[in-house]
Amino acid sequence: MAERQRQRPEPTAPAIVWEPEVQRAMRDFSVREAHQSLNGLFKPRLAVYWADFLCSYVVAVASFWAVGPLGGLTAGGAAAFVVSVLAVFRCFAFIHEIAHFRAKRSFNRFRNGWNIIFGIPMLVPVFMYDCHGEHHNRRFYGTGEDAEYLPLARMSLWSSVQLLVLPLMLPLFGPYRFGVVTPVSWFVPRVRTYLYRNLSSLKIDLEYEGRLPKPEEKLNWRLQEAACLLWMGAVAALVATGTVSLGRVWQWCALFAAVAVLNSARLLAAHRYVGNEEEMSVVEQMMDTVNHPRNRPLAELWAPVGLRLHALHHLMPGLPYHNYQLAHDRLVSALPPDSAYRLTESPGLCASLGRLVRESRAHQKAGTLLPARAAKPARAVPSDERAVR
């Protein structure tokens, strides 16, 4: 397929100003040497993936069910609900690993199993995260072509607050996307284009437009959409017949919203977001990203499946999550204390969020906030993307 044509706007913000110590560390940092020190850690072990995911899934289902007999307004019911949120969040986080290893044929069973067991019932099928590759592309990271990035440190603080508030509406997204727009899109090509451009990517940049499915992907995407629609129909039938109470549906909505808010908080802490919507090198991406190596048991709750060591992930996106801690320990041992990699560390979630708030306020005080984006120019769409039927 021909590459999507992109019309890059003229720069609208000054170049990124890194602190002097960061600049020196970036100049001295060698990605190749860091990679060589991690030899032998790049092979994913599927047994670990299956065991972790299935255990998390069992905990999620059991704790979700327990809320009913315990009572949602009791201490026990509230505790069970919190456990279900954390377990579901961990299950959901595996979509990130799936996005990185989807090219490996050995990963297909896990990808399909995760999708059937968790992705489709949660109305988050795997194709909705195919856009993640752009977040690691040197040309796209931090630009308007990156669905998962906004230069929040250079934007109004309200932009960050919105990312914590809007997820409360996400329980409505799945039913709307798969229950309303999807059936219409099967018969109206224009709606189908709108569906894939605007409603088929997990994103924080609401102006981001996703790609259309490739010819070889169309059937697979539609089958996943149909499965989500059938699942919704089955749930509706169970509720209508009284087999499942309406209260469980509201519980699912509360669960989904809580997971979405928790993930948004994690996202706000995952990067420094100091980009100016221009391309960044791999080292610059690493410096714009944050590691949270301290308080591992707590960090694993709000940044599960390796997401707490996010700077490591952007430096070495081919690492499987179960080797992150060993890889981090090797790098810390091999690199000097003033290494660029060591400068990506943050004490914790609150510290990272606090830094983002301070940087946004500093830009506001200095009058250097990014202006609101102008309307995006129309993108040329390759012929094979126009043929979406």
Set out the residue ranges of the language-model regions.
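Long helical/loop segments within the catalytic core of UDP-sugar-dependent glycosyltransferases
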Residues: L86, V126, P297-L307
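Transmembrane alpha-helical segments that form the membrane-embedded catalytic/substrate-channel core
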Residues: V85-I95, V124-M128, W252-S281
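Flexible internal linker/loop segments at domain or repeat junctions
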Residues: A270-L298
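Extended hydrophobic-aromatic, low-complexity segments
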Residues: G275-E279, P320, A327
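Histidine-centered catalytic micro-motifs
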Residues: C91-H100, M128-F140, L267-G275, V305-L319
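Residue-level signature of the transmembrane alpha-helical core
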Residues: F53, F81-V82, G113, I117, ...
